[in-house]
Amino acid sequence: MRYEYVPLKDQYEKEIVPALMKEFNYKNIHQVPKLVKIVINMGIGEGSRNYDLIERHANELAKITGQKPIVTRARKSISNFKIRKGMPIGLKVTLRGARMYNFLYKLINIVLPKVRDFRGLDPNSFDGRGNYSFGLSEQLVFPELNPDEVRRIQGMDITIVTTAKTDQEARRLLELFGMPFKRG
């Protein structure tokens, strides 16, 4: 296994762990919350009828994350949405390890500042178990994508899964990573 420099992982080990141990009075270093994975989900409504659209968005998601996405399929038929069981309805990527830290670094420092009318992430989007979810309305904010090649603007949901027991611990962990939450 080759060594890869991951700036956020170094920051976590050298700065964030000691700060959280002091702030929450942890006795053991293993009690400190850490990132487990980042899941990026892109729901494609018309994709069930247009396989070219799924391929195009899969390539975009692969460029953004550096990992090939999985096609998610409908679990049951819903006639109102014209969906049958087994039809492709979206794409999903799960990032762990170095790719996860690099994606988070890119998200915090490059992508979120490029979002139009961005005033910070909603601090109330935690799920009660220390996980944070938010959505991006378009994929063009990622530097890997050329706006001329993108045919259809598509949003995505991003979920950051942590080992934190409470939302307060998870929020503090993400704040120390540099996540821009709304003040107030």
From Swiss-Prot:
Any one GO CC term of the record: cytosolic large ribosomal subunit
**Any one GO MF annotation of this record:** rRNA binding
Quote the InterPro entries the UniProt record gives. Answer: Ribosomal_uL5 (IPR002132), Ribosomal_uL5_bac-type (IPR020930), Ribosomal_uL5_C (IPR031309), Ribosomal_uL5_CS (IPR020929), Ribosomal_uL5_dom_sf (IPR022803), Ribosomal_uL5_N (IPR031310)
Q: Name one GO biological process term.
A: translation
Claim: Glycoprotein is one of the keywords in the record = no
Give UniProt keywords alphabetically: Ribonucleoprotein, Ribosomal protein, RNA-binding, rRNA-binding, tRNA-binding
What family is it from? Answer: Belongs to the universal ribosomal protein uL5 family.
Q: How does it assemble?
A: Part of the 50S ribosomal subunit; part of the 5S rRNA/L5/L18/L25 subcomplex. Contacts the 5S rRNA and the P site tRNA. Forms a bridge to the 30S subunit in the 70S ribosome.
What does this protein do, in the record's words? This is one of the proteins that bind and probably mediate the attachment of the 5S RNA into the large ribosomal subunit, where it forms part of the central protuberance. In the 70S ribosome it contacts protein S13 of the 30S subunit (bridge B1b), connecting the 2 subunits; this bridge is implicated in subunit movement. Contacts the P site tRNA; the 5S rRNA and some of its associated proteins might help stabilize positioning of ribosome-bound tRNAs.
Q: Under what name is this protein listed? A: Large ribosomal subunit protein uL5
The organism is: Thermotoga maritima (strain ATCC 43589 / DSM 3109 / JCM 10099 / NBRC 100826 / MSB8)
